[in-house]
């Protein structure tokens, strides 16, 4: 039989106090909705239907082409949300997972175990439950003496005895698909909230003597539903521990994993060393035996093997093997650094390609440049690429030496093996093998300083 999935993502999330739909808030670099969608993939659903509502266009944009969408124009409860999927799923034979889009910590393994449990026990409905020493606020799972599920009782309706129950409803379920839509026709809004509750379907199945079961999560953290910023931070913390643990098991060293922030899609090779307060975001990839020191921040970039990045920022760029960057360097988007390049302290590179073995040791700006191999930039070198309206390119050949405090005004080309004298302002192309000097001649005026007020003779 087929598996189907319904993801509930229509809510506004008022307690988040945000213009962004709740399910689009990010945990470890991707939205909560994407986390749920990836986990749902573990059950290999034939159809996945996502119920949208508040700012539906933003939610749909995240999963465009990956799921079917239905709209819940009015948020009238979880049961009502599932009703919206009827045109797509009603009448199909199979098992349907119903899950909220604000549960980013649920794992694919747990969902696979849930649906296997449901099938193996021939249940018409299976509730995903969890156990906690502090069940306040959760619906409790009431069982009979044979451990069979009788009902779900909400906190406000629970007796003193029922409030002591530690097994809680996580809000995730698996149903026999055909029976689900038959039962939905019999639920109503006769409750304090005036809404259609999916939990009422469980009661209907019990009344008709059909088999309802419960599968209990091994890890309570997976049950976390995010309703406010506090829970969002908790989810981020749990996810960070999971991610860092995975990398450590795979051979990555962390000085302080609790103070290291790595997004879920980051790839790290073995033998990488990561110090505290390092942040790796987006689609970043780190090669083997690279060292990332305290304070390094890397976004959507590839760093090769054996590199050393010292307290620096790298954005949307590629860094080859053996490169050293920092401290306090900034590699801005669309840059590439060849093998064994050295970018030192207070150097900024933007939109430039730099050939292997090139060095810019300190206090240099390289913008919109194509730089060859074995080039040396002296301290204080500036490539001037912007005239207030347009950006221009500088091309620097192989084996070029640029003296300190030089200004290179684009568009200009420095030929192979050329040399720029220190303090020069270069406005014209420099031929290969030439020396370019673009500065005023030094003039010494003997004894002139004695006329100045600050000279000791005038004190």
Curated annotation (Swiss-Prot):
It is found in: Cytoplasm. One of its GO terms (cellular component) is membrane. UDP-N-acetyl-alpha-D-glucosamine binds at residues 8-11, 22, 72, 77-78, 139, 154, 169, 227, 332, 350, 365, 376. Residues 230-250 are annotated as: Linker. Residues 1-229 are annotated as: Pyrophosphorylase. Mg(2+) binds at residues 102, 227. It comes from the Bacteria. PROSITE patterns: HEXAPEP_TRANSFERASES (PS00101). Binds 1 Mg(2+) ion per subunit. It catalyses: alpha-D-glucosamine 1-phosphate + acetyl-CoA = N-acetyl-alpha-D-glucosamine 1-phosphate + CoA + H(+); N-acetyl-alpha-D-glucosamine 1-phosphate + UTP + H(+) = UDP-N-acetyl-alpha-D-glucosamine + diphosphate. Its EC number is 2.7.7.23, 2.3.1.157. Acetyl-CoA binds at residues 379, 385-386, 404, 422, 439. Gene3D superfamilies: Hexapeptide repeat proteins, Spore Coat Polysaccharide Biosynthesis Protein SpsA, Chain A. One of its GO terms (molecular function) is UDP-N-acetylglucosamine diphosphorylase activity. Pfam families: Hexapep_2, NTP_transferase. InterPro entries: Bifunctional_GlmU, GlmU-like, GlmU_C_LbH, Hexapep, Hexapep_transf_CS, NTP_transferase_dom, Nucleotide-diphossugar_trans, Trimer_LpxA-like_sf. Keywords: Acyltransferase, Cell shape, Cell wall biogenesis/degradation, Cytoplasm, Magnesium, Metal-binding, Multifunctional enzyme, Nucleotidyltransferase, Peptidoglycan synthesis, Repeat, Transferase. In the N-terminal section; belongs to the N-acetylglucosamine-1-phosphate uridyltransferase family. Homotrimer. Catalyzes the last two sequential reactions in the de novo biosynthetic pathway for UDP-N-acetylglucosamine (UDP-GlcNAc). The C-terminal domain catalyzes the transfer of acetyl group from acetyl coenzyme A to glucosamine-1-phosphate (GlcN-1-P) to produce N-acetylglucosamine-1-phosphate (GlcNAc-1-P), which is converted into UDP-GlcNAc by the transfer of uridine 5-monophosphate (from uridine 5-triphosphate), a reaction catalyzed by the N-terminal domain. This is Bifunctional protein GlmU.
């Amino acid at each position: 039989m087929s598996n189907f999935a319904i993801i509930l993502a229509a809510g506004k999330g008022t307690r988040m106090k945000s213009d962004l739909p709740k399910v689009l808030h990010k945990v470890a670099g991707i939205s909560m909705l994407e986390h749920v969608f990836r986990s749902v993939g573990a059950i290999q659903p034939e159809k996945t239907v996502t119920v949208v509502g508040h700012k539906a266009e933003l939610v749909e944009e995240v999963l465009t082409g990956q799921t079917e969408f239905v709209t819940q124009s009015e948020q009238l409860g979880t049961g009502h949300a599932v009703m919206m999927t009827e045109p797509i799923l009603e009448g199909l034979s199979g098992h349907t997972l119903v899950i909220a889009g604000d549960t980013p910590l649920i794992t694919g393994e747990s969902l696979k175990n849930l649906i296997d449990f449901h099938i193996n026990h021939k249940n018409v409905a299976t509730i995903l439950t969890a156990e906690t020493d502090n069940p306040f606020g959760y619906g409790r799972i009431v069982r009979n003496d044979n451990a069979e599920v009788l009902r779900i009782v909400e906190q406000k309706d629970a007796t003193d005895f029922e409030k002591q129950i530690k097994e809680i409803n996580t809000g995730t379920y698996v149903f026999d698909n055909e029976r689900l839509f038959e039962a939905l026709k019999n639920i109503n809004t006769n409750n304090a909230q005036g809404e259609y509750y999916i939990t009422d379907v469980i009661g209907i199945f019990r009344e008709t003597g059909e088999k309802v079961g419960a599968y209990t999560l091994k890890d309570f953290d997976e049950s976390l539903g995010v309703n406010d910023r506090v829970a969002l931070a908790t989810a981020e913390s749990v996810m960070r521990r999971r991610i860092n643990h995975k990398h450590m098991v795979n051979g990555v060293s962390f000085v302080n994993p609790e103070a290291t922030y790595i997004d879920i899609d980051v790839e790290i090779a073995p033998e990488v060393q990561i110090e505290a307060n390092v942040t790796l975001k987006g689609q970043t990839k780190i090669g083997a035996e690279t060292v990332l020191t305290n304070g390094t921040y890397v976004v959507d970039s590839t760093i090769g093997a054996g590199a050393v990045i010292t307290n620096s920022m790298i954005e949307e760029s590629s860094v080859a093997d053996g490169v050293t960057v920092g401290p306090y360097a900034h590699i801005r988007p669309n840059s590439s650094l060849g093998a064994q390049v050295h970018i030192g302290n207070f150097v900024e590179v933007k939109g430039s390609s730099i050939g292997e073995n090139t060095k810019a040791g300190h206090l240099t700006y390289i913008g919109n440049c194509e730089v060859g191999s074995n080039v040396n930039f002296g301290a204080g070198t500036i490539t001037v690429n912007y005239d207030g309206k347009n950006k221009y390119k500088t091309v620097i050949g192989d084996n070029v030496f640029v003296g300190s405090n030089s200004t290179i005004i684009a568009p200009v080309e420095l030929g192979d093996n050329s040399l720029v004298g220190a303090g020069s302002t270069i406005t014209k192309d420099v031929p290969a093998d030439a020396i370019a000097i673009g500065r005023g001649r030094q003039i010494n005026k003997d004894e002139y300083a004695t006329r100045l007020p600050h000279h000791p003779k005038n004190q």
